[in-house]
């Protein structure tokens, strides 16, 4: 059940600033299997809204076309770029990871064939219905991405 202020909907999307759209699309679209649902360049008052240095941004929404209201990953690039964030590392306060239900081994094989994702870390975690395959990889900009075996985590 959602609280009144959320209008009955779960989280719509998480936005990631990317350095290279081609490489990021190879990771999220070709590697993880997300569909491109929108690819558009917007001119707006982004300096006021986001404290950006540019009024132009490219936005690509990726996800499942059957679920337009939730679970979307937005790749964003501002004209002129943005400053790089802190280097990836151990968990810290703030943004931690993106997590996806996927066929873990198939997804790792696709990422490996595409030469994206870095060196995966894979475990079998004991769950209520038995072992659940889990792995983490890094997207092209260093974001930690968790892969959890689809259909096994909540049984």
Residue ranges of each PLM-predicted region?
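Core segments of cupin and vicinal oxygen chelate
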Residues: 17-69, 128
């Amino acid at each position: 059940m959602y609280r009144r202020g959320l209008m009955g909907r779960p989280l719509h999307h998480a936005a990631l600033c990317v350095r290279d759209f081609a490489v990021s699309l190879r990771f999220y679209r070709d590697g993880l299997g997300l569909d491109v649902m929108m690819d558009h360049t917007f001119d707006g008052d982004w300096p006021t809204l986001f404290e950006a240095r540019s009024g132009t941004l490219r936005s690509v929404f990726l996800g499942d076309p059957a679920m337009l209201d939730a679970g979307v990953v937005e790749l964003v690039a501002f004209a002129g770029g943005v400053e790089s964030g802190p280097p990836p590392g151990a968990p810290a306060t703030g943004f931690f990871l993106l997590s996806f239900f996927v066929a873990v081994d198939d997804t790792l094989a696709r990422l490996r064939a595409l030469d994206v994702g870095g060196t995966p870390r894979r475990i079998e975690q004991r769950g209520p219905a038995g072992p659940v395959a889990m792995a983490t990889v890094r997207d092209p900009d260093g974001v930690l991405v968790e892969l959890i075996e689809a259909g096994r985590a909540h049984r």
